Amino acid sequence: MSTTLANIRSGVNVTVTGFVDGDEGAVSKILALGIIPGDVLLVLAAWPAVVFEVGSTSYALDNELAGRILVTAET
């Protein structure tokens, strides 16, 4: 089941499945960071910003931007 990165609690691995339609500027920012569908993220913190790790790189996004990234939880 797909949800947004902003809805994931810390300690969870997720796979990026896509982006929410309607805000090309936000999607461009996310893509500029190198975050693409298929990436596996480990959420390190969920509040006040979403902090996650991709490989050996950590990122922090505000909840609005994290809410544009569609993910599924790893099982």
Model features per residue range: what roles?
Residues 1, 25-29:
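Short alpha-helix capping/helix-loop boundary micro-motifs
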Residues 20-22, 45-50:
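Short, charged beta-turn/beta-strand-edge "cap" motif at the junction between a beta-strand
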Residues 67-75:
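Beta-strand/loop-dominated core regions that host nucleotide or nucleotide-derived cofactor-binding catalytic loops
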